[in-house]
Regions:
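Juxta-kinase regulatory segment immediately upstream of eukaryotic protein kinase catalytic domains
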Residues: 3-56
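Catalytic-loop of the protein kinase fold
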Residues: 190-210
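Conserved short submotifs of the Hanks-type protein kinase catalytic core
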Residues: 140-154
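Activation segment signature within eukaryotic-like protein kinase domains
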Residues: 178-179
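AlphaC helix of the eukaryotic protein kinase fold
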Residues: 102-123
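Activation-segment/catalytic-loop signature of the eukaryotic protein kinase fold
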Residues: 136
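Activation segment/activation loop of eukaryotic-type protein kinase catalytic domains
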Residues: 204-246
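Protein kinase glycine-rich loop
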Residues: 62-68, 73
């Protein structure tokens, strides 16, 4: 499964959704506006204007919202019916014991970290096994990142689904095959100029994508379409010390 991902796996219209098999993607959705949109890839002129319009208005499905790190992710659909993941910075309620200046510094730090997550994600967008990144803007005044919506399950759920005993152990061969494919994914990071460190590789941050083949079909084939998600802790390798987790 080595190679490069030339584009997003699945931004098809939701009328035939890989998530729910169909239905009205706009039913019960909340409308949000994405302001000050900045594309992940450089463009200008009419192409830039057209690209911004593609993400200007999104319909979010709150039932899909998941919290992780300093943000929350929700599935969003644009007016063309394309689906994306919308990650918005989540700033906690202010501590009444903290001063106004302390709260402002804390919020500024979160925004800086969120921006760094976007920049790190840009470095791997386009690599096989990483979600495609579209851009960054603001939703209701909060920084927001628009990226590929990955259809699949995290390794947490995969382990449960494939467990052969009450302890949650997977078949040894399947575990080795998944480990091989995760290693293959990480090996591509060596091609990046300056390097890249994820720093939070866990069962919750590795997904098995099922938009092409079901989990059962991938088990049968012995190869897994794995994807690394959540770049909130990532950083360029040159910023690391002598100890880190890729």
């Amino acid at each position: 499964m080595s190679g490069w991902l030339s584009g997003p796996r699945d931004s098809r219209p939701l009328g035939h959704s890989a998530i729910d098999g169909g239905g009205d993607p706009f039913s019960g959705a909340r409308v949000v506006s994405v302001a000050h949109f900045e594309p992940a890839a450089g463009m200008q002129g009419e192409a830039l204007d057209s690209y911004k319009r593609r993400f200007g208005t999104l319909f979010v499905d709150e039932s899909t919202r998941r919290r992780g790190g300093i943000g929350s992710v929700v599935r969003a659909t644009n007016v063309l019916g394309e689906q994306f993941a919308l990650k918005t910075l989540a700033i906690p309620e202010r501590d009444e014991r903290a001063s106004e200046a302390e709260c402002e510094r804390y919020e500024a730090g979160l925004k800086t970290a969120f921006r760094q997550e976007f920049e790190c994600h840009k470095a791997v967008s386009g690599l096989k096994g990483f979600p495609h990144l579209y851009g960054m803007g603001e939703v209701a005044g909060m920084p927001a990142i628009v990226m590929e919506w990955v259809c699949g399950e995290t390794l947490v759920h995969v382990c449960d689904a494939l467990a052969v005993d009450g302890a949650g152990r997977m078949p040894t061969l399947v575990a080795a095959q998944i480990g091989r494919d995760v290693f293959d994914l990480l090996a591509h990071l060596d091609f990046l100029e300056g390097g890249f460190v994820h720093r939070d590789i866990s069962l919750a941050n590795v997904m098995v994508c099922t938009s092409r083949l079901s989990l059962a079909e991938q088990v049968e084939e012995g190869f897994f379409d794995v994807c690394l998600i959540d770049f909130g802790s990532s950083t360029p390798e040159e910023m690391q010390g002598s100890s880190f987790t890729r």
